[in-house]
Amino acid sequence: MLKLYIRPVCLLRPEEEVASLSLLVESRREKVRTIKGKENRSRSIAAGLLLRYMLLEEQIPYAEESFGLEEHGKPRLKKDGVFFNLSHAGAYVAGVLSDVPVGVDVE
């Protein structure tokens, strides 16, 4: 399995940012809160929403307990045999879901 997703990113109004954050797991919300700059926050939120969509489409729970951290702090799924990677830059966010370790770079 290899599924690639690419979506445009739009700047969020404050009320849209609040609503979007409520759909993300707490670890992603915490990450977003540390980001300075509206554009960078919007990209990070878009990446989190894309991951949520990717997992739910595959019927994988999007919940805090579904995630762990790799050795160097990179988020990973606890579910065996499912790997993801996200990238965001400029006006796009990209995500990939696979049954083998995988990476994606939107640039």
Positions of predicted regions on the chain:
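Core catalytic alpha/beta fold that binds nucleotide/phospho-ligands
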Residues: M1-E107
